[in-house]
């Protein structure tokens, strides 16, 4: 008589050690799981709710300045080191891991208008209202030695901004004109100007390092090529641009922070139309900085808040504010893409998480797997109304909330007026202008 025995491979169900998880046999046939999508929807909903529960972005406040913080700079080689300049001429160097000030320098008389680090991280440069450019060592002086700058350049006009070349011993300053300096000389290598108004900010391109951009008080954004020693082109907007920031991953993309509450992302090869208009702030945007990934940027505003925008979206994904934070003057995204720093005029530097609900520290493999799974579920169901409402909800200060409502009413009134004008005019006599093109006045080459 023949008897057929069931045989199973123990490797498929036996644990190697008692610490391993029990192996559960699964059949992935969809006919056996008719409620798979409803289950995933509930999981996505719970993951979205938990994300809002654990959204606690504020980490630390670095206090010590005796006047408003006017500018920030990152160390190019060290994640933990940050430099800040204040309105009383004081420069402080901070250690983010210990969250304390490790060095204080009385650098200028009056405002510190700009601060930047050398590409190798051995020194940094400051400019101030006292018409000087000073170079300082990154390491402090020895015991008993006085704090002295390495070099001091006496200028003829007030400098309003400074930025260092990403690869060479060259830096640029701006004021009445854009000056390109060699570190070994006391006179500028070349000076470039276009128009007569003062220039508030200058920034080198991190990829095409010979390109730089500046923004002036006459509403211009001017692009320069160091190799030509002449301006390339400029775009004139409706209102003044406070500063610009280049995308660290896409060579010809930059974002401008404007006085009309918006940010404009441009492609320098087609300046007549912005790539994207970013709208959410309710007051002038004062500073902008990209994340190292080039996918997002953070903006600082006069409305006492900072916002994080995806590059390809017109609305912000996150808004940060505190009860004590006043007008935010400067903002930086750290080089590891995990943290954001902002300096405001009530003398504090605040440290935030880039992802509000992110768990800090080392994650176990199961935590990583659960996090990735929840993230995929949230992306899959992100457009469902209930999940979308929970994910978008933010608590805002009453001042910002009321201003948002007011701006919404004004925008709707303008739209209604424009529709009525088109309706009661001869067909084709009133041009329809898109939101992107409304704010660009002209492009001059």
Swiss-Prot record:
Cited InterPro entries: Sof1 (IPR007287), WD40/YVTN_repeat-like_dom_sf (IPR015943), WD40_repeat_CS (IPR019775), WD40_repeat_dom_sf (IPR036322), WD40_rpt (IPR001680), WD_repeat_DCAF13/WDSOF1 (IPR051733)
Compartments reported by the entry: Nucleus, Nucleolus
Keywords: Acetylation, Nucleus, Repeat, Ribonucleoprotein, Ribosome biogenesis, rRNA processing, Ubl conjugation pathway, WD repeat
Region Required for nucleolar location: start-end pairs: 353-441
Family statement drawn from the similarity comment of this UniProt entry: Belongs to the WD repeat DCAF13/WDSOF1 family.
Annotated gene: DCAF13
Function: Part of the small subunit (SSU) processome, first precursor of the small eukaryotic ribosomal subunit. During the assembly of the SSU processome in the nucleolus, many ribosome biogenesis factors, an RNA chaperone and ribosomal proteins associate with the nascent pre-rRNA and work in concert to generate RNA folding, modifications, rearrangements and cleavage as well as targeted degradation of pre-ribosomal RNA by the RNA exosome. Participates in the 18S rRNA processing in growing oocytes, being essential for oocyte nonsurrounded nucleolus (NSN) to surrounded nucleolus (SN) transition. Substrate-recognition component of a DCX (DDB1-CUL4-X-box) E3 ubiquitin-protein ligase complex that plays a key role in embryo preimplantation and is required for normal meiotic cycle progression in oocytes. Acts as a maternal factor that regulates oocyte and zygotic chromatin tightness during maternal to zygotic transition. Also involved in the transformation of the endometrium into the decidua, known as decidualization, providing a solid foundation for implantation of blastocysts.
Stored Pfam families: Sof1, WD40
SMART domains documented for this protein: WD40 (SM00320)
WD repeat spans: 64-104, 107-146, 149-191, 194-234, 236-276, 280-319, 323-362
Residues bearing the modification N6-acetyllysine: 49
Record-given protein name: DDB1- and CUL4-associated factor 13
Domain of life where this protein originates: Eukaryota
Pathway annotation: Protein modification; protein ubiquitination
One Gene Ontology term from the biological process aspect of the record: decidualization
An MF annotation (GO) of this entry: ubiquitin-like ligase-substrate adaptor activity
Subunit and interaction comment: Part of the small subunit (SSU) processome, composed of more than 70 proteins and the RNA chaperone small nucleolar RNA (snoRNA) U3. Component of the DCX(DCAF13) E3 ubiquitin ligase complex, at least composed of CUL4 (CUL4A or CUL4B), DDB1, DCAF13 and RBX1. Interacts (via WD40 domain) with DDB1. Interacts with ESR1 and LATS1.
GO cellular component, one term: Cul4-RING E3 ubiquitin ligase complex
């Amino acid at each position: 008589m023949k008897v057929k025995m069931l045989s199973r491979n123990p490797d498929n169900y036996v644990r190697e050690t008692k610490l391993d998880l029990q192996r559960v046999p699964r059949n992935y046939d969809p006919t056996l799981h008719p409620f798979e999508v409803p289950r995933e929807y509930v999981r996505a909903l719970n993951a979205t709710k938990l994300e809002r529960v654990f959204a606690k972005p504020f980490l630390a406040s670095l206090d010590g300045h005796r006047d408003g913080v006017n500018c920030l700079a990152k160390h190019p080689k060290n994640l933990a080191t940050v430099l800040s300049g204040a309105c009383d001429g004081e420069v402080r160097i901070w250690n983010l891991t210990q969250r304390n000030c490790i060095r204080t320098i009385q650098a200028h008389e009056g405002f510190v208008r700009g601060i930047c680090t050398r590409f190798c991280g051995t020194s940094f440069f400051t400019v101030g209202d006292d018409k000087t450019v000073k170079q300082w060592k990154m390491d402090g002086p020895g015991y008993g030695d006085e704090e002295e700058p390495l070099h001091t350049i006496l200028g003829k006009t007030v400098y309003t901004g400074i930025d260092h070349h990403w690869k060479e011993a060259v830096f640029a300053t701006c004021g009445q004109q854009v000056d390109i300096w060699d570190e070994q000389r006391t006179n500028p290598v070349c000076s470039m100007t276009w128009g007569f108004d003062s220039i508030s900010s200058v920034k080198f391109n991190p990829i095409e390092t010979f390109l730089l951009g500046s923004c002036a008080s006459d509403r211009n954004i001017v692009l320069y090529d160091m190799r030509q020693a002449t301006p390339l082109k400029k775009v004139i907007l409706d209102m003044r641009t406070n500063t610009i920031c280049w995308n660290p991953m896409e060579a010809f993309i930059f974002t401008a922070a404007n006085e009309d509450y918006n940010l404009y992302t441009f492609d320098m090869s087609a300046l007549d139309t912005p790539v994207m208009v970013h709208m959410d702030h309710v007051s002038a945007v004062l500073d902008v900085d990209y994340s190292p990934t080039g996918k997002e940027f953070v903006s600082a505003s006069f409305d006492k808040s900072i916002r994080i925008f995806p590059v390809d979206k017109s609305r912000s994904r996150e808004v940060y504010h505190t009860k004590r934070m006043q007008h935010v003057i400067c903002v930086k995204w750290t080089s590891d893409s995990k943290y954001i720093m902002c300096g405001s005029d009530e003398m504090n530097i605040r440290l935030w998480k880039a992802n509000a609900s992110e768990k800090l520290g080392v994650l176990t493999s199961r935590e990583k797997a659960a996090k990735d799974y929840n993230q995929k579920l949230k992306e899959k169901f992100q457009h469902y109304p209930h999940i979308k409402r929970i994910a978008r909800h933010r608590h805002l200060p009453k001042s910002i909330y009321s201003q948002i409502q007011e701006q919404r009413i004004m925008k709707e009134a303008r739209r209604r007026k424009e529709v009525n004008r088109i309706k009661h005019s001869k067909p084709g006599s009133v041009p329809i202008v898109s939101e992107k093109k409304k704010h660009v006045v002209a492009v001059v080459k």
